[in-house]
Amino acid sequence: MIKKIGVLTSGGDAPGMNAAVRGVVRTALSEGLEVYGVYDGYLGLYEGRIEKLDRSSVSDVINKGGTFLGSARFPEFKEVEVREQAIENLKKHGIDALVVIGGDGSYMGAKKLTEMGYPCIGLPGTIDNDIAGTDYTIGYLTALNTVIDAIDRLRDTSSSHQRISIVEIMGRHCGDLTLMSAIAGGCEYIITPETGLDKDKLIKNIQDGIAKGKKHAIIALTELMMDANELAREIEAATGRETRATVLGHIQRGGRPAAFDRVLASRMGNYAVHLLMEGHGGRCVGIVKEQLVHHDIIDAIENMKRPVRSDLYQVAEELF
């Protein structure tokens, strides 16, 4: 029977992580369990930075961005000896199970701990929305609002200067954030891992728009597709129209979480505790068609694929 639960946040921070931690802590305490916070993710787990949490520990955090527990990249966690030390640190506090909030790298750590016999539940905390088995990840919709706000501001100045603007948006190998931002922000062109980049077609479309009297354009580009500044130089050389790239960077991860992310994170944190109490381990939580679900964490990492939103790409194609 579970008596003590640990919780950590790992990888890139996402708005709503604090709400998720709060959901875990308050639910566990309501069920008569003890809760321990692990500071700075798997690094802190390895170094033994673990402290008992109470209700006041998570007071006034639901509205704050980032994660008060801290987070850190710690690739050394893939080493067996490192994980053995981490488990030993959990056992020192009598912690029976762990809730891990983060992206696919964090899930991999939870998977490894599960394989070593330590029950873990994963919660999807990443602005990239690239986790299989869930329609939305914690932080995604807040980041979407942040990106749209930036696009709106860029459109103002691009229009004033008759300029083409490229907006580089986070997402790694998933174009969801770029796609939704482009639709909501009224972008003229979109480049994501799912669409690829036909540079000749892009330049021709821009030239056609200029010929029809279009004064400015916004291009939404997913990070890692190509160098945004190099693309800007090529477009300017081909069209004669001033072109500038704006890399939004880590501003997309910050800020007060939107109401949706606060509620989603709270629900997921609550659900994770109940899963552990029911004897589940090695699972990850998602939301599908507004219903909370859980999957085998190994399947989420290795077998499940996020569906390409072909319907929304069709909408984007017709609107752009």
Curated annotation (Swiss-Prot):
Compartment annotation: Cytoplasm
UniProt cross-references to CDD domains, sorted A to Z: Bacterial_PFK
Activity modulation: Allosterically activated by ADP and other diphosphonucleosides, and allosterically inhibited by phosphoenolpyruvate.
Protein name (record): ATP-dependent 6-phosphofructokinase
Function according to Swiss-Prot or TrEMBL: Catalyzes the phosphorylation of D-fructose 6-phosphate to fructose 1,6-bisphosphate by ATP, the first committing step of glycolysis.
Family note: Belongs to the phosphofructokinase type A (PFKA) family. ATP-dependent PFK group I subfamily. Prokaryotic clade 'B1' sub-subfamily.
One Pfam family per UniProt: PFK
Species assigned in the record: Vibrio campbellii (strain ATCC BAA-1116)
Catalytic activities: beta-D-fructose 6-phosphate + ATP = beta-D-fructose 1,6-bisphosphate + ADP + H(+)
EC number of the protein: 2.7.1.11
Protein residues bound to ATP: 12, 73-74, 103-106
GO BP, sorted A to Z: canonical glycolysis; fructose 1,6-bisphosphate metabolic process; fructose 6-phosphate metabolic process
InterPro entries referenced in this protein's UniProt entry, alphabetically: ATP_PFK (IPR022953), ATP_PFK_prok-type (IPR012003), PFKA_ATP_prok (IPR012828), Phosphofructokinase_CS (IPR015912), Phosphofructokinase_dom (IPR000023), PKF_sf (IPR035966)
Domain of life, per lineage: Bacteria
Cofactor(s) the protein requires to work: Mg(2+)
Coiled coil residues, start to end: none
